């Protein structure tokens, strides 16, 4: 039964542990605790009298677990009933019998669950059940000891005599017997709680004044198997009493218990006598000494105590019977012989190998090879080995001399991990950078004036010439080399800054067009050289990239000046021009004289952005002084594109070329000078900032309409915000535009031209929700509703004006 609440009272002294801490050592086991747990699983069969050995298997699982960790167990069993516990044993026996009868009655009524619970409480461990476990343990070479009376005293004796280094039990009485180390609540994995006697000082409730003797007194006063406690006295009150009392005579302290605790308690003489018997039972209970093979008291008798007067602590039956009882050869109740085990006889059957508790466990053979406690040459404490946590120390070398040579000494060191050697070790840093960079151009010095088509041999020779020539030749990355030279060959035919991979077409179309127009444009090239050379340094810089492109595409042509190109000047103006369509390019090439005439007309224009102004169409302003003079407004589509893109050649169908040069001159002279200067500045800013117009807009015949002075021109809302993109026609919903019936124009986005931005395209082709309101009082320059992207309803007066003008 133990002492109620003792483990919780001294929990500060307990600590978790694992049984492998005692590897190579010996532990004593209270086997009846395992038997009771194992019998709970087969309580119904035991109550019915059916044969079963489940309790044996349960106990052997713990034995195998201890052996697997290298711990040698000694199984200790209870012997005869102690005279001091006759009352306790009698009450327990009556309680078990009552539960058994109740369980049988519930089983007859069909209440199986309630009956099983009653059978569990009625479990009684018989000597025959203990003997079955002893036989199974002997097959594994495990020593077993049957105590003369109680197993608690026998366990304490084995621990005190250093035969067992620890005790495994579920009973807290072991601490009162004076055990040094007790393992409680151990599971099948070997985990449990360990309480050491030297750690009891950690408990704040006990304090430092407690000794082993006072601890035993406290356990007896709080109630134990040998004496029931007084009413209202537990561990707390008993501990308080012993801390307050300074008298070494415990009997006098017990008599004055009410005064110390300030309680109305009367201590009878029977209680004081029972306290004395209980204390002597804890001290002088009979046990069996396996080394001397004698029955001895737990502690030696003092001189003032008569052993015959301690019959309540056990009766000595003699050393011979005590040995046979300890070996398990005699029945403890009838004292009849049930077995003939002789530890001195040689074992004919080797012990069975213990079972491992897991896949990774290896059974330690040191536990089974240790000498038995029944052998003649057994010495207590010889099986105690060093703790596994403490490393094995080498023998001391003090006073010893030895010559040590360090010549062949190889110190342990971390080997540096060497990466696998690269196959392409002859590559230089520049070659590696060139292979993994996309925008870097490397031009090798050309020794020949003309370039030959690249072949495999030429590629290898050029690679050896440009790359690193030092070191032996090793295989290189063929794929990187081929891609590198392919990129170099393509650099001569296309410009990286203006090439669009989304809108570009095959370069073969442009190359064929240029080859067909070489002979026709030879004369125009000479006139263009003279004209462009006068334009200044800005124009030469703009034409520098087309010159490189011409040198690579036409190696057989004679070297040209840095500012010339095989294309018309309007096409080769770098990022400030739009090449237009292939159809328009053919027109400009087929009429070189007309292009040269237009260029000579603006030869006196300053350099820079003003040079590009010569390609800009000035919008004509009508002077109403002459009644017969009138100019056409902007065309429905394409006129604004032609005016905003200086690089595009003028179309023959546009309204701009439908007027004679004399009429244009007279109209321009009649314009207001202030408005003309302001508008010219605005056009210059638009020309320099606006992107190239879309080449997909098809040019339609111009509709000649006269501009009315009554219509006010929409103010520029984005003058301070950079370039404004003006559209050539009102914005229309996607998919509603009528597709042209003629041949689709060829997109020539690969030619150098200013790239359009997404924000500009959104501003140009998106719907405008609120159309600007026209003020009747504000007068301004007339505008075209189509050209300014303003949708207006034509009133009746406007229609009449248009009719009169026509």
Curated annotation (Swiss-Prot):
Query: What EC number(s) has UniProt assigned to this enzyme?
Result: 3.1.-.-
Binding locations of Mg(2+) 1 = 30, 78, 150, 152
Positions of region (N-domain):
1-99
Subcellular location as annotated: Nucleus
Q: Residue spans with biased composition (Polar residues)?
A: 355-378, 447-458, 533-542, 578-589, 602-615, 744-754
Q: Which InterPro entries match?
A: 5-3_exonuclease_C_sf, EXO1_H3TH, HhH2, PIN-like_dom_sf, PIN-like_EXO1, TPR_rpt, XPG-I_dom, XPG/Rad2
Kindly give the Gene3D superfamilies that the UniProt entry links to this protein. 5' to 3' exonuclease, C-terminal subdomain, 5'-nuclease
Question: In which residue ranges is the amino acid composition biased (Basic and acidic residues)?
Answer: 412-425, 592-601, 676-685
Where along the chain is composition biased (Low complexity)? 651-670, 686-696
What does the Swiss-Prot or TrEMBL cofactor note state? Binds 2 magnesium ions per subunit. They probably participate in the reaction catalyzed by the enzyme. May bind an additional third magnesium ion after substrate binding.
List cofactor names only.
Answer: Mg(2+)
Name the job this protein performs: 5'->3' double-stranded DNA exonuclease which may also contain a cryptic 3'->5' double-stranded DNA exonuclease activity. Also exhibits endonuclease activity against 5'-overhanging flap structures similar to those generated by displacement synthesis when DNA polymerase encounters the 5'-end of a downstream Okazaki fragment. Required for DNA mismatch repair (MMR).
Official protein name in the record:
Exonuclease 1
Q: Which organism is it from?
A: Danio rerio (Zebrafish)
Organism taxonomic ancestry: Eukaryota, Metazoa, Chordata, Craniata, Vertebrata
Protein's gene: exo1
């Amino acid at each position: 039964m133990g002492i109620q609440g003792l483990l919780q009272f001294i929990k500060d002294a307990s600590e978790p542990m694992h049984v492998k801490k005692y590897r190579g050592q010996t532990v004593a086991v209270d086997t009846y605790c395992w038997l009771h747990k194992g019998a709970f699983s087969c309580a119904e069969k035991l109550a019915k009298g059916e044969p079963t050995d489940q309790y044996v298997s349960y106990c052997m699982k713990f034995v195998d677990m201890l052996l697997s960790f290298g711990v040698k167990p000694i199984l200790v069993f209870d012997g005869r009933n102690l005279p001091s516990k006759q009352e306790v044993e009698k009450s327990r026996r009556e309680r078990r019998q009552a539960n058994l009868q109740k369980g049988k009655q519930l089983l007859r009524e069909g209440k199986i669950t309630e009956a099983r619970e009653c059978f569990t409480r009625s479990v009684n461990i018989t000597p025959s059940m203990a003997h079955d476990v002893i036989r199974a343990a002997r097959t594994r070479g495990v020593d077993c000891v049957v105590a003369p009376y109680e197993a608690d005293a026998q366990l304490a004796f084995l621990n005190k005599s250093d035969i067992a280094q620890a005790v495994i039990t579920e009973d807290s009485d072991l601490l009162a017997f004076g055990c040094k180390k007790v393992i409680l609540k151990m599971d099948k994995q070997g985990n449990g709680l360990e309480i050491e006697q030297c750690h009891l000082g950690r408990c704040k409730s006990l304090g430092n004044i407690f000794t082993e003797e006072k601890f035993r007194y406290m356990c007896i006063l709080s109630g134990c198997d040998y004496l029931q406690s007084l009413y209202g006295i537990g561990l707390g009150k008993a501990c308080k009493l012993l801390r307050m009392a300074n008298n070494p005579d415990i009997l006098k302290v017990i008599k004055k218990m009410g005064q110390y605790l300030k309680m109305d308690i009367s201590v009878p003489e029977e209680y004081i006598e029972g306290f004395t018997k209980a204390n002597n039972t804890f001290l002088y209970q009979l046990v069996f000494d396996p080394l001397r093979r004698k029955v001895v008291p737990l502690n030696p008798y003092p001189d003032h105590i008569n052993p015959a007067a301690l019959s309540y602590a056990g009766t000595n039956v003699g050393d011979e019977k005590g040995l046979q009882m300890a070996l398990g050869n005699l029945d403890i109740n009838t004292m009849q012989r049930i077995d003939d085990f002789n530890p001195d006889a040689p074992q004919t059957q080797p012990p069975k190998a213990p079972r491992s508790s897991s896949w990774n466990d290896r059974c330690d053979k040191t536990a089974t090879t240790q000498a038995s406690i029944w052998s003649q040459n057994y010495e207590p404490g010889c099986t105690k080995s060093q703790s596994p946590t403490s490393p094995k120390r080498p023998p001391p070398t003090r006073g010893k001399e030895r010559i040590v040579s360090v010549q062949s000494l190889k110190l342990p060191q971390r080997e540096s991990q060497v990466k696998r050697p690269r196959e392409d070790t002859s590559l230089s840093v520049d070659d590696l950078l060139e292979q993994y960079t996309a925008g870097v151009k490397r031009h090798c010095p050309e020794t020949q004036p003309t370039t030959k088509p690249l072949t495999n041999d030429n590629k290898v020779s050029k690679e050896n010439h440009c790359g690193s020539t030092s070191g032996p030749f090793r295989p290189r990355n063929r794929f990187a080399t081929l891609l590198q030279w392919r990129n170099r060959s393509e650099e001569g035919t296309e410009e990286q800054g203006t090439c669009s991979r989304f809108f570009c077409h095959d370069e073969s179309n442009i190359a064929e067009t240029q080859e067909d127009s070489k002979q026709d444009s030879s004369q125009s090239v000479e006139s263009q050289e003279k004209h462009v050379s006068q334009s200044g340094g800005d124009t030469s810089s703009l034409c520098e990239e087309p010159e490189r492109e011409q040198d690579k595409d036409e190696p057989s042509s004679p070297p040209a000046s840095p500012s010339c190109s095989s294309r018309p000047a309007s096409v080769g103006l770098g990022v400030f021009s739009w090449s237009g369509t292939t159809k328009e390019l053919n027109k400009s090439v087929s009429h070189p004289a007309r292009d040269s005439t237009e260029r000579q007309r603006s030869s006196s224009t300053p350099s820079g952005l003003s040079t590009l102004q010569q390609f800009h169409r000035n919008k004509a302003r009508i002077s109403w002084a002459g009644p017969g003079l009138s100019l056409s407004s902007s065309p429905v589509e394409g006129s604004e594109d032609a005016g905003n893109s200086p690089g595009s050649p003028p179309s023959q169908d546009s309204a701009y070329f439908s007027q004679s040069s004399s009429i244009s001159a007279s109209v321009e002279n009649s314009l207001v000078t202030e408005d003309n200067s302001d508008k010219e500045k605005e056009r210059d800013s638009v020309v320099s900032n606006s992107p190239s117009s879309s080449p997909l807009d098809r040019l339609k015949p111009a509709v000649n309409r006269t501009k009315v002075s009554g219509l006010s021109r929409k103010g520029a809302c984005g003058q301070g915000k950079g370039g404004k993109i003006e559209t050539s026609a009102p914005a229309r919903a996607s998919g509603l535009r009528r597709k042209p019936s003629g041949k689709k124009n060829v997109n020539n986005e690969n030619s150098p031209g200013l790239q359009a931005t997404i924000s500009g395209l959104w501003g140009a082709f998106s719907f405008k929700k609120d159309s600007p309101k026209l003020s009747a009082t504000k007068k301004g320059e007339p505008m075209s509703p189509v050209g300014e992207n303003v949708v207006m309803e034509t009133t009746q007066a406007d229609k009449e004006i248009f009719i009169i003008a026509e």
